[in-house]
Structure formats: C-alpha cells, structure tokens
Amino acid sequence: LEYKLQIKRTPCRVEIILKESEFKMRYELFKRLNTGGEGLSRQEIRNCIFRGLDSRYSEFIAELAQNDIFREIVNISVSNEEKMYYEELVLRYLTLKNKGTRYSQANIQDYMDDYLESQCKEFDDTQIETDKTLFVNIMKILEKLKDENIFKLGKRYFTTSMYDAIMLSLSENMIDLEELNIEQLGKKIAILKEDDNFNKYVGSA
C-alpha cells in the first residue's frame, strides 16, 4: 500500500513533440530522455533522430561502415560495433574532410551533429559519389599496406587522432598517392608515427 501511494503521488512529466517542432529542440529532448539503464551512444541517437529528417545520408554512412577493409583495419569490439562505432568513425572522417578540422562547437560530437544535420537537409548525390569513391580508394591503399596497427598508437590501442591524421592526409593527397608506391607510403607513415611532435599531439588528443 505504501508503494502504491508513492507511485500515485509521484508527478509524471509529459513532453509533447509535434511534427512541426523545431528540429534541434526535438534532438535535445531525445538526448535528455536517454538516461537511466543502458543509454544509447551518440551515434545511436543520431541514427534515430536524423533518419526522421532524411534517411539517405545515414544509409550512405552505414554503407561505408560495412566496407570489409575498413572493418578489418579498425577491428573494434562487438560491444562498440553494437553502439555503431564504425558508423561514428565514418561520420567523423566525412565531417572533418568536408567541413574542416577547425570548429567552434564545444566538442567534435556537436560538430558532427551539425554536419550530419546539414547533409540531411541538403542531400547532394554528386558529393556522395565523390566521397564514396575516395573512401573506397583509401581503403584499397590501406589494404595494400598490410598494417593492422596503422590506426594504433604503437601496437597498443586504436586512437581517433591517428585515424584522423592518416585518413585526412590520404584524402587530401590521393592524386600524389597514385604515383607513390606502397612501400614508400608505408615508410612515410612509419616516419610520421615516430615523430616526437606528432606523438605528442596524438597522445594528448
């Protein structure tokens, strides 16, 4: 009886979200409701919210995240895969490549949110094909390097800073890379990883 009375006396807050409600308001409310129990990852929230805006860009991200070479090199845990970390890494790369590496938001997650929202609102088929071709070509190059630790700091753990540096460098220099043999590229990456300034940046990021 005591518990029943407590339940009856506990206020229940109701939030009404209309279809025409401002998008950011709906997104913020969804994030706030995602508390207690096992919360969703940021990418899982994006997958729920932004598909309601336009599902095509999320489907494009999911397609790239299924790339066999990409998954073999990144090689995350099952739990992280379930939290859509492959998709988050693809979105991270596309955001930094297409929107730049400098951002005014509090953190890169907010920056990625803004980028994904903009792509959903202004879907560009031509840009999609360009990004897809480039991503696939980068993966083919990485496969030829035969380095399963390429995104790792030493041989210890995957680091997003190493991932960002290598993915963005390859995407910005693809034309030059076509004339560079794989052995030379591997040596250049190895030299980069041994650079003290680079390691200082990667280790602190």
Where do the PLM segments sit?
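Basic- and aromatic-enriched surface patches that contact anionic nucleotides/nucleic acids
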Residues: 1-113, 179, 183-191, 197-204
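Generic recognition of stable, solvent-exposed alpha-helical segments in well-folded globular domains
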Residues: 24, 85-88, 133, 137, ...
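An acidic intrinsically disordered interaction segment
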Residues: 48-66, 121-140
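Short amphipathic alpha-helical segments and their helix-coil junctions
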Residues: 62-79, 135-153
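Conserved phosphate/pyrophosphate-binding and hydrolysis machinery centered on Walker-type P-loop NTPases
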Residues: 79-83, 128, 156
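Small-residue-rich helix-loop
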Residues: 105-139, 145-151, 155, 162
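C-terminal hydrophobic structural anchor segments
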Residues: 143-197
